[in-house]
Amino acid sequence: GAFIMPGTLWCGAGNAASDYSQLGTEKDTDMCCRDHDHCSDTMAALEYKHGMRNYRPHTVSHCDCDNQFRSCLMNVKDRTADLVGMTYFTVLKISCFELEEGEGCVDNNFSQQCTKSEIMPVAKLVSAAPYQAQAETQSGEG
């Protein structure tokens, strides 16, 4: 089965929630993941979109969604949120995409040759910056 972070239903590969309103015990972190899962502009593995094919084995999201996800997790300020943030941005280094004006193929005539291209927003991958942990370390620990 897919890996879901303990205490959450939405953090990890896929989700374990039966409906949108359902959240795990780590509610705040789970809400960040749920919002990110519902990003309005994503590219599934091997999908061709915005003039680019996503050759990664996972979905990539528009950078606006990833930036919002990062801020959301950082505002939770607990260890679960940090673990999710570190896993996604620092360990897995999941890229996001931004749209830039460029030349994209609109008709490739079912061959490798592009027969018609035009100026359109074209996706460009952006590498993830490492996540900065936010949980306060307890004084007198470690």
UniProtKB/Swiss-Prot annotation:
GO molecular function: metal ion binding; phospholipase A2 activity
Leading EC class: hydrolase
Pfam families (alphabetical): Phospholip_A2_2
GO biological process terms, semicolon-separated: arachidonate secretion; lipid catabolic process; phospholipid metabolic process
EC number: 3.1.1.4
Cofactor: Ca(2+)
CC cofactor note: Binds 1 Ca(2+) ion per subunit.
Disulfide bonds: C11-C33, C32-C72, C39-C65
Predominant place of localization: secreted
Tissues where the protein occurs: Expressed by the venom gland.
Compartments, record wording: Secreted
Keyword entries, A-Z: Calcium, Disulfide bond, Hydrolase, Lipid degradation, Lipid metabolism, Metal-binding, Secreted
Active site: H36
Binding site for Ca(2+): W10, G12, G14, D37
One GO location term (cellular component): extracellular region
Reactions mediated catalytically: a 1,2-diacyl-sn-glycero-3-phosphocholine + H2O = a 1-acyl-sn-glycero-3-phosphocholine + a fatty acid + H(+)
InterPro entries documented for this protein: PLipase_A2_dom, PLipase_A2_dom_sf, PLipase_A2_His_AS
UniProt similarity note: Belongs to the phospholipase A2 family. Group III subfamily.
Function (record text): PLA2 catalyzes the calcium-dependent hydrolysis of the 2-acyl groups in 3-sn-phosphoglycerides.
Record's protein name: Acidic phospholipase A2 PA4
Species this protein is from: Heloderma suspectum
